[in-house]
Amino acid sequence: MRTSFRPILFAAILFAALFVLPSNIKAQPPQEVMNAAETKLALKKLNILGSALYVAAHPDDENTSLLAYLSGERKVCAAYLSVTRGDGGQNLIGTEQGALLGLVRTQELLAARRIDGAQQFFTRAIDFGYSKSPEETFAVWGREAVLSDVVWVIRRFRPDVIITRFPTTGEGGHGQHTASAILAVEAFEAAGDPARFPEQLKYVETWKPKRLMWNGFSRGGGGAQANRSGLISVDVGAYNSLLGKSYTEIAANSRSMHKSQGFGSAERRGSALNTLQTIAGDAPGADLFDGVDLSWRRVPGGEAVGKILEEAERTYEPENPQASLPLLIRAHREMSKLPADNSWVE
């Protein structure tokens, strides 16, 4: 049976859309009951069918502002793939080291995702401390084994866009950082190739993302600013009027979950431009999701579902949320008519 990490799980939506945050991955911790504004946002997200996967090496490497923006402003299924669990980091809040520290930092990542709205994935790779080069890193990790894990996540989550935190050219300052970017590039191609890791195809199908981007930075005139080709800007400082917060404020709270590393940042509002440079795939025009159908039309026969969900969002009553149930039931019935092999409904 083919499976995906990003289904809407509509069997639970009749309650989840009104009372709890929808869960797109069974391993995620349960969410708290939503208020009226969060419920409205959840209804909006039901009508957006898109996904983005952020890839880096460790817990705390992720760009929480971009994840919050993707989940809240673009309303796509966003996820962070941390290649390791941070076993080799410091611990400022306890005595745990090694694998036990990895457990602590795993929980910190899950806590961060509950705030910024993204999902969380890992591979089998161990953080063994500072590494001077990607070659040294791969010698410890086992390149093909970890690559297979990254390919597995891509084939199951099926992202439209993949974004790396670090470049493949070493400016990340850590061998594991560079290795995570190299793996993302290799997995971008391998996930769509049935000859690569064919044993996975018993459970998943091949998947080819639309594009691979680098979330660039500029240091000493280098980084993304050194090559303007295929470069776009994203303002992750946008304000969410439903939540009464900007995505940088949400991100600050998310990042502050990395307590063992002493990480945290002050909440702030205002424009916060991020640069994204095309590494592989189709270069976007002005928008990260150019060329990607984010509507229910991407599922054969799904247009009727989209229209019903639009009506549910438009007629939602904050003081009478149960009034949306008849429309959600109609949408559920329409979803039951969709092809069984679509990856958006389970």
Q: What do these predicted ranges mean?
A:
Residues 8-22:
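Bacterial N-terminal signal peptides
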Residues 2, 6, 25-53, 133-137, ...:
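Metal-dependent de-N-acetylase/amidase catalytic core
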Residues 28-156, 178, 185-189, 193:
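Active-site rim/loop-helix segments in enzyme catalytic domains that contact anionic ligands
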